């Protein structure tokens, strides 16, 4: 434990980001964005490309929060299956949402190519290895639904999953060839560079302290300045604070932790995810894992409710790595870090319009690389005057999570319970608890 670096692997391996200064004085713009994560920078980039003068204010450095700390998995779609979405939202609205979110990786990799972003981008696909026969049956239904919609998705046998993952613990799985991986911080910094090259302005260390409507425009106050604009986009996701209490109460921030091994020797590395896919398994507290460009295994899962590394989180993640890949027991771990994931009640991201000229996008439920990039484009299109019917994504009312003040306690208890349920299943070989699988 003494040699464990309490820092993100991505902060060590990403190219430097742009140098930005705090906001000072009174500025004006045609659009202002709060938050320089994937959502905010995607929105700013699309606005700047449309010729709008845009200012982004960021509370910290670019990438210090979720967009620079995640696993870098570019996953198509949202968690509910396509048929479920069409049943809940209707065939038209649900169908358009399925199409919009399913194409998320297309947008990510198109932006990377168009702006020359160096971020170790690899589009080898995304795997869902099944941890039980029941989970495999659900994956089979998911495959059928996506195939009906023309997606490049296939069901895998036990031997095929073994070949693609190098792990013998799974009984089959799903391969979605639309997905891929990026170095998440490098991708974010590349988006920031693209915003600046396109004429946008980004101010770091400029937390939004106050947001108010004044003389026909929105005004954002920061410690050393202010910016006013007719349109403001709130893009703070799980880190939304008092700038919008009503938005903060629509989601529950849940910690996610990751560990990274030292570079794996070549003879071992060739047997682990040999084709370069990312994977997220089907445990209730799913484990997501991938290799980085340096040959390190990166694995993450839900953590305890603390943003500081906890011994039990470290031990849980070490055990998970060795359960999936027992051949790595001699490989040291070099990095450990965590961040917050915004979870919503319906497991869907939300596009909100709390007031005229005020927009927000949040709640990616662990699929933020692709979905937040898409949300940024949707918010930009709405800010540019697109009608809601043109977006291909519904605008949701702002509805708080019931008993939000207690949601952290409930989520903490749920995480501990699901760890217990998954542990029983691993010991007993089958899951008997009545808990719905929604990986």
Regions found by a protein language model. Give the residues of each.
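Extreme N-terminal leader/targeting segments of oxidoreductases
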Residues: 1-31, 49
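Helix-loop-beta segment of a Rossmann-like dinucleotide-binding subdomain
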Residues: 20, 118-128, 160-194, 198, ...
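N-terminal Rossmann-like FAD-binding beta1-loop-alpha1 element of flavoenzymes
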Residues: 27-56
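Glycine-rich FAD pyrophosphate-binding loop
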Residues: 49-69
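Active-site substrate-recognition segment that forms the wall
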Residues: 74, 106, 114-122, 208-210, ...
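Dinucleotide-binding Rossmann-like beta1-alpha1 core, especially the glycine-rich loop
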Residues: 77-158
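Helical element adjacent to the flavin cofactor pocket in flavoenzyme catalytic cores
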Residues: 137-145, 149, 168-230
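C-terminal catalytic lobe of FAD-dependent flavoproteins
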Residues: 307-423
């Amino acid at each position: 434990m003494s040699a464990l670096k309490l820092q993100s692997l991505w902060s060590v391996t990403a190219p430097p980001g742009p140098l930005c200064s705090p906001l000072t004085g009174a500025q004006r713009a045609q659009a202002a964005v709060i938050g320089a994560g994937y959502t905010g920078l995607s929105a700013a980039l699309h606005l700047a490309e449309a010729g709008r003068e845009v200012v982004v204010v960021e509370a910290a450095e670019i990438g210090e929060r979720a967009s620079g700390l995640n696993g870098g998995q570019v996953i198509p779609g949202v968690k509910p299956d396509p048929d479920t979405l069409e049943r809940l939202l209707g065939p038209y609205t649900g169908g358009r949402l399925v199409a919009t979110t399913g194409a998320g990786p297309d947008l990510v990799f198109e932006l990377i190519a168009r702006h020359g972003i160096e971020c170790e981008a690899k589009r080898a696909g995304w795997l869902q290895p099944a941890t039980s026969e029941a989970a495999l049956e659900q994956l089979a239904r998911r495959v059928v639904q996506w195939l009906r919609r023309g997606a490049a998705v296939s069901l895998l046998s036990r031997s095929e999953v073994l070949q693609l993952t190098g792990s013998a613990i799974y009984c089959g799985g799903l391969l979605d060839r639309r997905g891929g991986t990026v170095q998440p911080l490098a991708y974010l910094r590349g988006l920031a560079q693209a915003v600046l090259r396109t004429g946008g302005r980004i101010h770091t260390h400029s937390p939004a302290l106050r947001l108010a409507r004044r003389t026909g425009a929105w005004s954002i106050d920061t410690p050393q300045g202010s910016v006013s604009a007719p349109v403001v986009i709130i893009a703070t996701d799980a880190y939304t604070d008092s700038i919008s209490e009503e938005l903060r109460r629509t989601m529950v921030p849940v910690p996610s932790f990751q560990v990274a091994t030292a570079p794996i020797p070549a003879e071992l590395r060739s047997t682990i995810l040999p084709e370069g896919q990312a994977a997220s398994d089907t445990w209730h507290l799913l484990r997501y894992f991938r290799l980085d460009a340096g040959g390190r295994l990166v694995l993450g899962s839900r953590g305890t409710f603390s943003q500081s590394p906890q011994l039990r989180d470290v031990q849980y993640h070490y055990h998970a790595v060795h359960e999936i890949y027992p051949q790595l027991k001699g490989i040291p771990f070099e990095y450990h870090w965590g961040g917050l994931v915004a979870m919503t009640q319906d497991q869907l991201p939300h596009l909100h319009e709390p007031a005229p000229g005020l927009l927000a996008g949040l709640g990616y439920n662990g699929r933020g690389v692709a979905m937040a990039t898409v949300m940024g484009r949707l918010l930009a299109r709405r800010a540019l005057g697109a009608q809601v019917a043109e977006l291909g994504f519904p605008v949701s009312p702002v509805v708080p999570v019931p008993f939000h003040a207690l949601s952290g306690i409930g989520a903490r208890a749920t995480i501990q319970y699901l760890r217990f349920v998954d542990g029983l299943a691993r010991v007993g070989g089958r899951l008997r608890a009545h808990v719905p699988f929604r990986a």
